[in-house]
Amino acid sequence: MDDPASYELDPSIAQRVKFNSAGLVPAVVQSTDGEVLMLAWMDAHALAYTIATRKGTYFSRSRNEYWIKGLTSGHTQQVTGLQLDCDGDTVLMTVVQQGGACHTGDRTCFDADVII
């Protein structure tokens, strides 16, 4: 496996992304049918790796390490689209999800605690 930390974000993209003070940007991940699957965090290296490989790759704040979705679970994400919101401070990724997107194994992280 390549190391996501070795990937550099294209400067023309980097200047458009507003990373927070920790160097992270939230990524909303949705399926190709528009279902929201999860929210995760990316740094510039994770974003660069995702663009280069088309594999959903994130930065785990709790483990302080890169996380390529499906590397251990087999529940992979093939990225088919990636865009920034109007402020450049959120990434929207469209993926073909194989297996569950949630760490619990569920398809989405947003089906366990429905409030309304």
Swiss-Prot record:
It catalyses: 1-(5-phospho-beta-D-ribosyl)-5'-AMP + H2O = 1-(5-phospho-beta-D-ribosyl)-5-[(5-phospho-beta-D-ribosylamino)methylideneamino]imidazole-4-carboxamide. It is found in: Cytoplasm. The keyword Magnesium applies. Its cofactor is Mg(2+); Zn(2+). It comes from the Bacteria. Its EC number is 3.5.4.19. Binds 1 Mg(2+) ion per subunit. GO terms for cellular component: cytoplasm. Pfam families: PRA-CH. One of its GO terms (molecular function) is magnesium ion binding. Zn(2+) binds at residues 86, 102, 109. Pathway: Amino-acid biosynthesis; L-histidine biosynthesis; L-histidine from 5-phospho-alpha-D-ribose 1-diphosphate: step 3/9. Keywords: Amino-acid biosynthesis, Cytoplasm, Histidine biosynthesis, Hydrolase, Magnesium, Metal-binding, Zinc. Mg(2+) binds at residues 85, 87, 89. GO terms for biological process: L-histidine biosynthetic process. It is an enzyme of class 3 (hydrolase). Catalyzes the hydrolysis of the adenine ring of phosphoribosyl-AMP. Homodimer. Belongs to the PRA-CH family. HAMAP family: HisI (MF_01021). This is Phosphoribosyl-AMP cyclohydrolase.
